[in-house]
A protein has these predicted regions:
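P-loop NTPase motor domains
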Residues: 1-121, 136, 197, 205-229, ...
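Conserved ATP-driven motor cores of ASCE-family P-loop NTPases powering translocation/secretion/packaging/pilus
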Residues: 113-216
């Protein structure tokens, strides 16, 4: 290792930095968790598997573990697709990335997102608002949105999100306006004026005021859809969940 030939001060600095980065792995519980490979990550692309990574939303101390998991999964699945299955996994893998803002992601996540679909790997990014995405990817947030073929808006109270949906996703609608005029008197007359004008399909304020029963769905190449949200309590398997009394 070349660093051993550095000056004592430089070597000491490297050792301190390394010790700080690996400090949490001194915990016996964490060391036991990461000592051996029990997940067989490539198998997720070869058979149906549900893998849950649960993290607390009020404590980010160990969120780096999920970051490591994501990084290794992307690497393993891409390698498997490219070198064993000719570029596409036999079983599609779908990442449901809740708490997206609280998890450290690979630095090249934007590039990963752009090339994953051809390998039968998909991701659903779940965020409170667009501002959170801008905070995470200041220069690449538009590219990330552009690489998502579907955008589902469930509601919110953040201004830049309302504006983006109104101006960039919904577009404008056409309004037909008829104006009638009538004047009385000896030479009274009657006139009609027909005019076509445009306005936002929904203004930012109307997006903000969206009824909580509804959601807005945008699919690439299709018209926007406003539809009722699905009531999860009506799902036929709800009795198997904690919400259903299991």
């Amino acid at each position: 290792y070349s660093f051993v030939f550095l000056r004592p001060l430089g070597l000491r600095l490297i050792q301190i930095t390394l010790a700080a980065r690996l400090e949490k792995f001194n915990l016996s519980s964490l060391a036991a968790l990461t000592a051996t490979d029990e997940l067989n990550l490539p198998s997720l692309g070869e058979k149906k598997v549900a893998l849950f990574a649960l993290i607390p939303d009020n404590d980010t101390s160990f969120n780096f573990l999920v970051s490591i998991l994501y990084t290794q999964l992307f690497q393993q699945l891409f390698y498997l697709a490219d070198y064993k299955y000719g570029g596409s996994l036999p079983v599609p893998v779908h990442f449901l990335m809740d708490e997206f803002r609280n998890v450290s992601l690979p630095e090249d996540f934007s590039k990963i997102l752009a090339v994953m679909r051809s390998r039968n790997v998909y991701v659903s990014i779940i965020l409170q608002n667009v501002a959170a995405l801008k905070a995470l990817f200041e220069k690449e947030w538009e590219s990330i949105l552009g690489n998502c073929d579907e955008f589902l808006y469930l509601g919110g109270n953040e201004t830049s999100t309302h504006k983006l949906i109104s101006e960039s996703y919904l577009g404008k609608s056409t309004i037909d306006t008829n104006t009638y005029g009538k004047s009385s008197g000896r030479n009274g007359n009657y006139s009609t004026n027909y005019q076509i004008s445009g306005r936002e399909l929904l203004t930012p304020d109307e997006v903000r005021m969206l009824d909580n029963r509804y959601a807005l769905l945008f699919i690439r190449g299709e018209r926007p859809v406003m539809d009722e949200k699905y009531d999860i309590l009506k799902h036929p398997n709800i009795h198997r969940t904690e919400d259903g009394g299991a």
